[in-house]
């Protein structure tokens, strides 16, 4: 009997589960809330397949249920599903609130990491600028010109060319954006931009919710944004 290939990471296990149970797991896009106690169902159904251990299944489930796309799917009115996609009851308010807090904390951690990275880049740029200014070349002494002998004719001084004033370079015009005043006028699939500080990132409308607009960035990340951060 040939040895079955072994899955080495939680992402590989999730991809296997999405292929094995397509009505329950998904490899991309919004995920459906899972049935409570689905871990034991997985152990019973995939025991021995792909040399999977309980530890690997538990780690993969933890990664899957803590992902942003899964937390987005845990919302009021959503229904839990079993391995075959059969409904297993609606989510209760406590689980929805817990998922919302997890999502907010995850977003806050990402923003803090980005701010820290930007601060380090600014510090590195400032340090590099100081190093460039520090070593200055020593000025060499000007060579002494011999004195003109008495009676020798003076050579006419050459006129220096008139230096032209440097042309002023116009600063590039800032790109003007129109703020979104009414999110109800937006449509799914519509292209717009998300303001992030002084920059605006391209995005596509995925869903209009009571808390704002869920958009997907070009990087593939999706998030809910309030109207004041959206522009055309």
Curated annotation (Swiss-Prot):
Got a GO cellular component term for this one?
A: cytosol
- SMART domains assigned to the protein according to its UniProt record, in alphabetical order: ProQ
Which keywords does this Swiss-Prot/TrEMBL entry list? Chaperone, Cytoplasm, RNA-binding
**Compositional bias ranges of the Basic and acidic residues kind:** 117-136, 147-177
Which processes are annotated in GO (biological process)? post-transcriptional regulation of gene expression
Task: Give start-end positions of Basic residues composition bias.
Answer: 137-146
UniProt xrefs under Gene3D superfamilies = ProQ/FinO domain
Subcellular compartments: Cytoplasm
Superkingdom of the organism of origin: Bacteria
Instruction: Identify the stretch(es) annotated as Disordered.
Output: 105-182
**InterPro entries named among the record's database cross-references:** ProQ, ProQ/FinO, ProQ/FinO_sf, ProQ_C
Q: Which Gene Ontology molecular-function terms are recorded?
A: RNA strand annealing activity; RNA strand-exchange activity
What does this chain do? RNA chaperone with significant RNA binding, RNA strand exchange and RNA duplexing activities. May regulate ProP activity through an RNA-based, post-transcriptional mechanism.
The family note in this entry says: Belongs to the ProQ family.
Q: What is this protein called?
A: RNA chaperone ProQ
What's the source species for this entry?
Escherichia coli O1:K1 / APEC
């Amino acid at each position: 009997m040939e040895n079955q290939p072994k899955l080495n990471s939680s992402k590989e296990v999730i991809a296997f589960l999405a292929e094995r149970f397509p009505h329950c797991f998904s490899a991309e896009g919004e995920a459906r809330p899972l049935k409570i106690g689905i871990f034991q169902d997985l152990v019973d159904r995939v025991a021995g397949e792909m040399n999977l251990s309980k530890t690997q299944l538990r780690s993969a489930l933890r990664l899957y249920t803590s992902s942003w796309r899964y937390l987005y799917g845990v919302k009021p009115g959503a229904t839990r599903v079993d391995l075959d996609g059969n409904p297993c009851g609606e989510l209760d308010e406590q689980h929805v609130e817990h998922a919302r807090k997890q999502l907010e904390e995850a977003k806050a951690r990402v923003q803090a990491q980005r701010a820290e990275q930007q601060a380090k880049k600014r510090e590195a740029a400032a340090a590099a600028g100081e190093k460039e200014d520090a070593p200055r070349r020593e000025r060499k002494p000007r060579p002494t010109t011999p004195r003109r002998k008495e009676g020798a004719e003076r050579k006419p001084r050459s006129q220096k060319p008139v230096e032209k004033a440097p042309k002023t370079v116009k600063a590039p015009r800032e790109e003007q954006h129109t703020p979104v005043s009414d999110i109800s006028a937006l449509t799914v699939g519509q292209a717009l931009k998300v303001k992030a500080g002084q920059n605006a990132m391209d995005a596509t409308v995925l869903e209009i919710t009571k808390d704002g607009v869920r958009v997907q960035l070009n990087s593939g990340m999706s998030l809910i944004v309030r109207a004041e951060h959206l522009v055309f």
